[in-house]
């Protein structure tokens, strides 16, 4: 009997064990499964958010690289446009300078021609004037009774002297 008292069960402990098992099963059914489901859903949601953020980050880097490439291309195109405009302006300036030099040369040539023409006109007027003076002098000499040969020689010598003197100047 002693053995029976040693094996005797304390029904209070058995009820506590049964209650703990029942409580565990109820909590597992009502609390652990929803909490576990909630935790798994939350973990999946966070993983999806991280994945979307990484994809968005990759897209942002791709767009950034694309925009930087476009900006660099625009800068290069702008520099090319500026170089081309500068080259055209330089060519236009050279053309204007060349035209101005040609016009100046043309005006100088025209002025030289006009000066030569005026010089020739003055020389011709002087020759006419000298001829008139020579004729006047000749008529005065004739009045002084010089023979005809001497008179002609005197006039031609006078014209030669005056003509050579004016041509040499």
UniProtKB/Swiss-Prot annotation:
Membrane-spanning intervals of the chain: 5-27
Pfam families xref list: ATP-synt_B
Any one GO cellular component localisation term in the record: proton-transporting ATP synthase complex
Keywords associated with the record: ATP synthesis, Cell membrane, CF(0), Hydrogen ion transport, Ion transport, Membrane, Sodium, Sodium transport, Transmembrane, Transmembrane helix, Transport
Membrane topology: Single-pass membrane protein
One BP annotation, GO: sodium ion transport
GO molecular function: proton-transporting ATP synthase activity, rotational mechanism; proton-transporting ATPase activity, rotational mechanism
Entries under SUPFAM superfamilies matching the protein: F1F0 ATP synthase subunit B, membrane domain
Family: Belongs to the ATPase B chain family.
General function of this protein: F(1)F(0) ATP synthase produces ATP from ADP in the presence of a proton or sodium gradient. F-type ATPases consist of two structural domains, F(1) containing the extramembraneous catalytic core and F(0) containing the membrane proton channel, linked together by a central stalk and a peripheral stalk. During catalysis, ATP synthesis in the catalytic domain of F(1) is coupled via a rotary mechanism of the central stalk subunits to proton translocation.
Assembly and oligomerization: F-type ATPases have 2 components, F(1) - the catalytic core - and F(0) - the membrane proton channel. F(1) has five subunits: alpha(3), beta(3), gamma(1), delta(1), epsilon(1). F(0) has three main subunits: a(1), b(2) and c(10-14). The alpha and beta chains form an alternating ring which encloses part of the gamma chain. F(1) is attached to F(0) by a central stalk formed by the gamma and epsilon chains, while a peripheral stalk is formed by the delta and b chains.
Misc. comment: The ATPase of C.paradoxum is of special interest because it uses sodium ions instead of protons as the physiological coupling ion.
Protein name as it appears in the record: ATP synthase subunit b, sodium ion specific
Organism of this sequence: Clostridium paradoxum
